[in-house]
Structures are given as structure tokens and as C-alpha cells.
Regions:
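Flexible loop/turn segments at secondary-structure boundaries
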Residues: 2-4, 17-18, 32-34, 136-138, ...
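Acidic (Asp/Glu-rich), glycine- and aromatic
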Residues: 2-27, 172
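A short linear-motif detector with a strong N-terminal bias
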Residues: 3-5, 69-73, 82-84, 106-110, ...
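A general secondary-structure signal for short beta-strands and their flanking turns/coil
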Residues: 7-11, 87, 157-159
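Active-site/ligand-binding surface loops and adjacent short beta/alpha elements
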Residues: 17-103
Length: 174
């Protein structure tokens, strides 16, 4: 806005295709990704979905694997908060097949939150192995309560940078 401050939330949406049995890894410590506990209004929990959530919380389902994730409908969402505590940059990978990896890297001061969003049904097969964000995808009020809502001064701008792509087996990512 040219005349008043405005709130800002930004999530870089990259919905990579769901590849059965893919493995994900990240520069974060084990356990940094946690299952989202809130249930958004657009999600209608089924018995199977509730059981999947219980299995995730019990450690029976690996947050870094798509093995068995064909049952993730509605979506299963993981979040990692306060990424700057883990370093200046964060890197995430999804090994799609023996021949290549998807990779995403970003600065944690720009994106202090990461979301992993997985959905598999007849219409959508998505493995968003990382969605860099300024806040969780739970809306403005939740971001404000968490202290992650950005307020831009009138006329101010903000720039974000994400590097993502596909690497062949053995190819370096610099």
C-alpha cells in the first residue's frame, strides 16, 4: 500500500508430483517437522485419516517417506518452525528415483517456517516436500498469535528468494 502499513504472509508454493516410495531429507535435525495438529475447515476428517494421524504421532509412519502415503486423503501436513535456529540456510531434497533428486534451498531469515504438504487421491497427487513460508499456512490470526505476521510500512517492499530444481544422480548443488 502507498498510504498505510499492511500485513504480509508468504508461502512459496511448489507442488511437486507425488512419486511413490520417494524419500525426503533436509538439513534440519530429526524431529524438526511435526504433524499439524489443527484441522482446517476445508478438511473433513475420515476414520482412516484420523488413524493415519495417530500412526504418525506414534512413530509408525515416517515423515520423510512417501511409503504408504497413497492413503493421505485428506492431506497430511507437517510443519517445521523457527528455522533460523538450525542455520542461515535450509536445504531439502526428495529422491524421486535412483536417477535424480528434487532440491530446494532458501535463507531461513526470509522463510522461518517450512511446511510439508502431501495429498494423494483420484484428482491430486502432490508431494510438496517443502513449502518455504514466513508463517504456517493457518491464516492471518494464527500468524499474528505466533508472532510470524510481517507488517510492511507504507510503500515498503519485501523480496524473497528460493532456489529449486532437479539434480541428476551425482550432480552437485552449489
Amino acid at each position: 500500500s502507498k498510504y498505510q502499513s499492511m500485513p504480509l504472509q508468504y508461502i512459496c508454493h511448489m507442488n511437486y508430483a507425488f512419486i511413490p516410495e520417494a524419500r525426503m531429507s533436509q538439513s534440519l535435525p530429526d524431529g524438526a517437522f511435526q504433524l499439524r495438529r489443527s484441522v482446517p475447515n476445508h478438511v473433513a476428517p475420515t476414520r482412516q485419516w484420523l488413524r493415519i494421524n495417530e500412526d504418525i504421532l506414534a512413530g509408525k509412519i515416517d515423515a520423510d517417506s512417501l511409503v504408504g502415503a497413497e492413503a493421505f486423503d485428506p492431506e497430511i501436513v507437517y510443519v517445521a518452525d523457527d528455522l533460523p535456529q538450525y542455520g542461515k540456510t535450509a536445504e531439502f531434497r526428495m529422491q524421486a528415483r535412483a536417477h535424480h533428486n528434487f532440491v530446494t534451498r532458501f535463507r531461513t531469515d526470509q522463510f522461518p517456517v517450512a511446511t510439508r504438504w502431501i495429498l494423494h487421491n483420484a484428482d491430486q497427487r502432490v508431494a510438496a516436500y517443502v513449502l518455504p513460508g514466513t508463517s504456517r499456512p493457518e491464516g492471518r490470526l494464527a500468524a499474528e498469535a505466533a508472532g510470524t505476521l510481517i507488517h510492511l510500512d507504507a510503500g515498503a517492499t519485501r523480496t524473497f528468494s528460493v532456489t529449486t530444481g532437479l539434480l541428476a544422480q551425482g550432480e552437485a548443488f552449489d
